[in-house]
Amino acid sequence: MLQFVLASASPARRQLLQSIGINPLVYQSNFDESSVAIADHHELVQTLARCKAEVVANQLAAPALVLGCDSVLVLQGKIYGKPKDPADAIARWQSMRGQSGELLTGHTLIDLYQNKTLVRLEITQVDFAWISDRQIAAYVATGEPLNCAGAFALDGRGGLFVDRIVGCPSNVIGLSLPLLRKMLTALGYSPADCW
């Protein structure tokens, strides 16, 4: 069995991996995302994912597969990561409701067994429901949107306020499982090698 390391403290990403039989070692990269200033949304999430994975990979003493991810919501050309505070989350939801956005997740898989690195991007369209200010306030009061890129969790209460997903649902949660399978295959592995 290959050692699999998740370079993220995200419980949602860990749970997605566990749901497919991968029990990762979890290392938080503590990479300072503010040190990266890239205007292109696609390049930004891929660079952040790579940096997070590299920080963790450089700390490991033994070979492993190291997965780093970074997600942002792009709405009307603007990037939204995690909200700063409840007021920010409320303001975001007031601008997001009834709109469509793109959830971008950069994925980096570093193979320390073969000294190879793959960097990929998954984009999923998210159509948000029109919800009232009262619903927004109640949702934000749960605290859930404060820990999520785009201020919503598809796999939580936030799923109530998403009308449609076009593309990969697991990508919206933080990790595209089909893309991970393709990346493992490109490196010559099967997901079962990580079970």
Curated annotation (Swiss-Prot):
| A Gene Ontology cellular-component term | cytoplasm
Gene3D superfamilies this protein is in? Answer: 3.90.950.10
Could you tell me the Gene Ontology terms of the biological process aspect for this record?
A: nucleotide metabolic process
EC nos: 3.6.1.9
Quote the subcellular location field of this record: Cytoplasm
Name the active site residues.
70
Cofactor(s) this protein requires: a divalent metal cation
* InterPro entries to which the protein is assigned, alphabetical: ITPase-like_fam, Maf-like
Q: Which reaction does it catalyse?
A: a ribonucleoside 5'-triphosphate + H2O = a ribonucleoside 5'-phosphate + diphosphate + H(+); a 2'-deoxyribonucleoside 5'-triphosphate + H2O = a 2'-deoxyribonucleoside 5'-phosphate + diphosphate + H(+)
Molecular function per GO: nucleoside triphosphate diphosphatase activity
Q: Which UniProt keywords apply?
A: Cytoplasm, Hydrolase, Nucleotide metabolism
Instruction: Give the matching CDD domains.
Output: Maf
Provide the family line.
Belongs to the Maf family.
Task: Give the function comment from the record.
Answer: Nucleoside triphosphate pyrophosphatase. May have a dual role in cell division arrest and in preventing the incorporation of modified nucleotides into cellular nucleic acids.
Put simply, this protein is called Nucleoside triphosphate pyrophosphatase
Which species does this protein come from?
Cyanothece sp. (strain PCC 7425 / ATCC 29141)
